């Protein structure tokens, strides 16, 4: 499927309404230079740019936002979680997933703690479950190569667009999701777009260039 520039960079109306708030929240959590760059101090009437910048640089900020979130997170995770996996308890790849949930060496507990931190900052975050699109002949080969589902945390400012469809029985399902996956050193943007049957990776050199579909894969999870 080909995409126009407008389609690739289009964002949901809720995204447009909230993206500035999300930027304020993460800069407030990071504090320091990030907060200064946000220029959240109110300007005085007739204040020159150099005077405003000097005032920004001279305004110390004790980062209570980060302290409160870290204290709350420590309280929530001070006791190890107890989980009942039910019928999944004998799943061969479960232990590998619990030990390395994101394929970056972080345990499931560590990923959930990070998700909780982001939820405290933004009000919510997204956990996307995906599986590498690698073909094997047998389940044994899949287990040997550790081909299994993994989790990715996506923060709200990177979830650009989505759509829910109502089924005949009245249930809503998510049938479209567009995520900004990466911005490269040259300013190009990689988008990952989920549909019920497929996942497309789209690249645009800039918001002035036509986007290109660089990969299409079956949606193995749905």
Give names to the regions the model predicted.
Residues 1-154:
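Extended, helix-rich architectural segments
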